């Protein structure tokens, strides 16, 4: 089973870019093959902006409708791209906070996840999105259920600085997180382990985003930082940057965690605790 037995009906949301129809179909087929009921998204009205699935108002309305539907057990994002930050001031967070529902995705979904954390609404879950469900590898597949059940997941990382640290998780795409810095939807990071990933960014831009988050105070009271995948970035330059960054913040730092746009992807919830000790990672609820 991809998802645990308590996830019987999934609501598909498209909060950012539009998913290609063939990927929508293959993802829904993968869910139904597992015996999961799917609330298929009604086509959003045409949007003049090609890289968005619909207007901010229509996308926000779609989320609220499915979030508050008592028959829906989980919200699954169809894909990332760009657009989630546009929705944050449009969502009725007070109303959404009354129902604790998992919302699964990553990448641009960081904007929703961090706002959920800041407004204490729902449960952010990092896991594959609908468009990739039919093509995930076995390691990724086996790790998904643990994000909902709390079952222990383990892997290995490279220690950049320090030996051990532990805390609840705050994870996100680096570029999106930097966009939220200093705004109304920037979450409290006290006692958290910060997990960050990105894709196709030159190292100087990664440094710029890390500097912005550093100056916004994200790392001040955090327990440490774990870097996921940064595919498309120069590995040697990244290693140098991570070392300089660790010296700047004077916190434990690890790199190479399987989280990001590459496979495998280890799924987890913001309610999980992550423990890193001498390069070994254990995640459990």
Question: Where are the predicted features?
Answer:
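ATP/NTP phosphate-donor binding region
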Residues: 1-71
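Conserved beta-alpha junction segments in alpha/beta enzyme cores
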Residues: 19-23, 168-201
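Short acidic/histidine-rich motifs immediately flanking catalytic phosphotransfer sites
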Residues: 69-74, 221-222
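N-terminal glycine-rich "phosphate-gripper" loop used for MgATP/nucleotide binding
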Residues: 74-85, 106
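Short, acidic/small-residue loops that bind anionic groups at enzyme active sites
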Residues: 91-115, 123-129, 251-254
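Conserved anion/nucleotide-ligand pocket segment
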Residues: 121-182
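Internal helical hairpin/lid segments
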Residues: 185-238
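ATP/nucleoside-binding phosphotransfer catalytic cores, i.e., glycine-rich phosphate-binding loops
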Residues: 229-285
């Amino acid at each position: 089973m991809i998802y645990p037995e308590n996830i019987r009906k999934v609501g598909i949301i498209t909060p950012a870019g539009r998913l290609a129809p063939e990927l929508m179909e293959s993802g829904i087929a993968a869910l139904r093959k597992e015996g999961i009921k799917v609330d298929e998204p009604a086509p959003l009205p045409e949007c003049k902006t090609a890289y968005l699935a619909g207007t901010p108002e229509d996308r926000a309305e779609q989320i609220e409708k499915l979030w508050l539907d008592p028959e829906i057990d989980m919200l699954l994002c169809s894909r990332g791209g760009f657009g989630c930050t546009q929705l944050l001031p449009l969502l009725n967070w007070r109303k959404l906070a009354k129902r604790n529902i998992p919302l699964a995705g990553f990448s641009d979904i960081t904007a929703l996840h961090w706002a959920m954390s800041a407004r204490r609404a729902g449960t952010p879950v990092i896991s594959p999105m609908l468009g990739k469900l039919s093509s995930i590898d076995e390691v990724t597949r086996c790790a998904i259920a643990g994000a909902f059940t709390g079952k222990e997941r383990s892997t290995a990382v490279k220690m950049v600085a320090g030996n051990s640290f532990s805390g609840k998780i705050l994870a996100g795409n680096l570029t999106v997180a930097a966009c939220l810095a200093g705004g109304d939807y920037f979450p409290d990071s006290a006692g958290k382990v910060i997990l960050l990933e990105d894709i196709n960014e030159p190292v100087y831009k990664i440094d710029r985003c890390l500097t912005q988050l550093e100056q916004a105070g994200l790392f001040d009271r955090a327990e440490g930082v774990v870097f996921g995948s940064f595919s498309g970035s120069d590995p040697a330059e990244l290693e140098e940057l991570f070392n300089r960054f660790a010296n700047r913040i004077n916190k434990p730092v690890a790199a190479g965690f399987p989280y990001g746009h590459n496979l495998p992807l280890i799924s987890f919830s913001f309610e999980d605790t992550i423990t890193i000790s001498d390069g070994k990672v254990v995640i459990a609820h």
